[in-house]
């Protein structure tokens, strides 16, 4: 039915739309806040603003029939201006769930408020234990590693980086480890992002994609070594705002609280960063081997998702345990071994310093940096290893002075000259063949 002046909406005079009045009425009908140009409802961030454009189109299509695309774009921009809000608080005392708000003291309310992240799972304290999920994990991981996974997945429910860890799940392939990512997607919804850890480090726009995200999953980790690790290390331990860039937008400062969960066939390594800080931020769990002749269940994920309310309670249990332990994860002996193996395989200087027949640690001895490096290159040659730089070897020793009971000095006497080296270590002369 054609509209007449008597049926025109208040914001339309027959020729023009009163944008202020339209936006006020639209926001009364669809409450929203605009933070840094992005719209939020009580259900969290609106990822697809096309939904809002469609609602605007429905409102105006009764009175206008041409130029709709441009008008919708202009009205959306006006709505954002009128809905302006400073950044929403990062709340670590509660979890916004599909049916209300769960508080970390164990209380729950059905009330909803504006938030950065609203999970897509409901809080149901009477949900049955997730038997299929627990069976799946028992077939995937060693029993002592399951509490670590439970704590990490619980850690991903809160917008905090106090745990200062990323989790790597390593296997030979085909074990089903990536099912965990799909289950987390069902709990977190749009608060989870799937991308590559390599992209996070190398693409300057990728960090902005992690804003307002609780979890980033890399379900097929690239095995090539990272050329840099600055951003990854900063994000894992993020405690203050960092620079964000979006295409066509002036860079700005924002705080990230995203956690990294990576699945792959090998560990995350760096091309140049062999520091303890890089490895200290990682938890490495290895999966059980895939049983020979096992028939994979194509409906496994569907079965797991039917238990998502119970899985959420299981994750909450891990979160409460983690907080009770002051954000210190339960790390099994096997997981610690995994980390040491990764460190040694990516930094052969560690193996050299623990070897015999090339160097000897003695309190009353000394060796020049050159002599130590020559011993190291002999070790590399004997073990078919590619040698690192002389600076890298000296740096490794200097960073671990207390561990090896050595002391860096520039007062080692060699052939009447004073050179750089270390006290407390000597190079062993090679035996003649």
Question: Where would I find each of the regions flagged by the language model?
Answer:
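Structural recognition of the conserved hydrophobic beta-strand(s) that form the central parallel beta-sheet
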Residues: 216-218, 258-265
């Amino acid at each position: 039915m054609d509209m007449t002046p008597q049926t025109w909406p208040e914001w339309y005079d027959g020729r023009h739309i009163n944008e202020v009045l339209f936006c006020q009425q639209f926001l009364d009908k669809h409450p929203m806040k605009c933070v840094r140009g992005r719209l939020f409802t009580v259900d969290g961030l609106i990822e697809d603003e096309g939904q809002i454009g469609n609602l605007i189109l429905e409102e105006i299509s009764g009175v206008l029939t041409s130029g709709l695309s441009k008008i919708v774009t202009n009205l959306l921009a006006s709505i954002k201006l009128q809905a302006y809000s400073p950044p929403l608080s990062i709340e670590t005392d509660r979890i916004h769930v599909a049916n209300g708000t769960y508080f970390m003291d164990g209380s729950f309310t059905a009330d909803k408020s504006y938030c950065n992240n609203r999970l897509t799972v409901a809080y149901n304290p009477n949900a049955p234990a997730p038997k299929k999920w627990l069976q799946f994990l028992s077939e995937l991981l060693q029993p002592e590693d399951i509490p670590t996974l439970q704590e990490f997945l619980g850690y991903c429910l809160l917008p905090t980086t106090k745990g200062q860890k990323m989790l790597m799940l390593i296997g030979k392939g085909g074990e089903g480890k990536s099912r965990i990512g799909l289950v987390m997607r069902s709990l977190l919804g749009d608060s989870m992002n799937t991308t590559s850890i390599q992209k996070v480090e190398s693409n300057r726009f990728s960090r902005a994609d992690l804003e307002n995200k609780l979890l980033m999953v890399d379900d097929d980790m690239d095995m090539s070594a990272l050329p840099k690790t600055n951003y990854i290390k900063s994000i894992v331990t993020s405690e203050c705002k960092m620079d964000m860039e979006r295409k066509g937008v002036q860079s700005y400062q924002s705080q990230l609280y995203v956690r990294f969960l990576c699945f792959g066939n090998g560990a995350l390594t760096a091309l140049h960063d062999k520091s303890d800080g890089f490895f200290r931020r990682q938890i490495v769990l290895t999966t059980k081997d895939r049983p020979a002749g096992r028939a994979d269940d194509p409906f496994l994920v569907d079965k797991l998702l039917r238990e998502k309310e119970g899985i959420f309670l299981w994750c909450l249990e891990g979160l409460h345990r983690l907080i009770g332990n002051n954000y210190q994860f339960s790390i099994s002996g096997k997981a610690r071994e995994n980390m040491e193996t990764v460190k040694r395989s990516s930094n052969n200087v560690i193996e050299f310093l623990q070897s015999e027949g090339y160097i000897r640690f003695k309190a009353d001895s000394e060796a020049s940096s050159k002599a130590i490096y020559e011993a190291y290159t002999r070790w590399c040659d004997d073990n078919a290893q590619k040698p690192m730089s002389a600076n890298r070897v000296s740096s490794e020793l200097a960073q671990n002075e207390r561990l090896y009971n050595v002391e860096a000095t520039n007062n080692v006497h060699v052939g009447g000259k004073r050179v750089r080296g270390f006290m407390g270590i000597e190079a062993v002369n090679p035996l003649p063949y």
